[in-house]
Amino acid sequence: MTKTRCMHVHFRKILQRVKKTLRLSASDQQSQGVTEPLSLGDLPEECISLIISFTSPRDACVFALVSKTFESAVQSDIVWEKFIPPEYESLLSRSQHFSSKKELFFALCDESVLINVSKKDLWIEKATGKRCMMLSASALNLSTHHTWKWITNPVSAWLETVPELLTTRWFEIRCRTNTRFLSPRTRYSVYIVFLKADICYGFAYVAMEAVVRMVGHELSESCRRYVCFHEAMEWQFLTRKNLVNPERREDGWMEIEIGEFFNEGAFRNNDEIEMSVSETTQRNTKRGLIIQGIEIRPTKKPGNEMP
């Protein structure tokens, strides 16, 4: 099957979804004189734009490859306005001009144009249009502040200073944040982003308890798991099969997925999510962890959206 034919089939499926959403029943179609299934040639460009707006930014870019008509339809503000947070104007840190909603969308995806709100950096995931958030280290509740020192950021320029752990036995990081800036009806994964200093020890065989939960929602899901900040050697994976291990990021940092949650709400809701990573039982000496912050991104698994 050719790429164009595949896109046509995909388009027809989307059209069926739109009809269902608009509750356009078969009898409604018949009363309007529609006796045959709609074909692509029957649709005006504005209608094509509207239908594409029900997909995702990734799909929209693929649709643009189908034909000149589709390419033109994808450029419409009708498409990209659906992918932009409705409250974006109140989140922009400074006045900026964009020639189109598409240009605005890709600007909000650019990490160099982060939106800063109360120690939170917000941006849009390019493929899905979902909102992401980074809580900087200054927004975190670090156990016993005198056991941390603030140093020049060794990797990123947008955060000038980050905390480095001094010698301690009691390790605990906690934070809370409102979920109203995140995309509604979306499952999110939570990551702690970190580095290890030149002198770093006390984390190799230590399991940290990580908890992610909705505040005040006792009946809602609570995610609890054990993580390790030390990269496992190949021979260690069997003995650490129940631990979540760190992964290296493209930006030079490392991250550990500490939990997941489902964000039901929308902008202006009052739901809060609480996240913590702690180890207070073994009491072994620890040193040298550098924390960038906690990042919240859409989960890269089936079930990202509720039906």
UniProtKB/Swiss-Prot annotation:
GO molecular function, one term: carbohydrate binding
The name this protein goes by in its record: F-box protein PP2-B7
Domain F-box: residue ranges: 37-83
Superkingdom: Eukaryota
Provenance organism: Arabidopsis thaliana (Mouse-ear cress)
Xref: InterPro entries: F-box-like_dom_sf, F-box_dom, PP2-like
Transmembrane segments: none
UniProt signal peptide: none
PROSITE patterns to which the protein is assigned, alphabetical: FBOX (PS50181)
